[in-house]
Amino acid sequence: MARCPSELFDDIADVLAEVRAWPGIVEKGPGVFYLRRRPFLHFHLAAGGARRADIKGRAGWIPFDLPRPVSATRRRAFLRELRIRCRER
């Protein structure tokens, strides 16, 4: 599965800006985030153009579908999931 190009992050720019400000988070490349030197979040573009985030949890990678454009409800759910997984680690 291909990495998602950065130009497809425009509708989640506010979420990514918040994540960048969290302690211990480093953006190694566009849309590739590490938490304390370990992979935490990256994005894929599936066949047909479906966008998906992979969030690293305690038990492994958790897929999170992010349709474009993302709804406000889905954006809040994504941010909530990121906060939960960040606290786990």
Named regions from a protein language model:
Residues 1-89:
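Charge-dense, helix-prone N-terminal extensions
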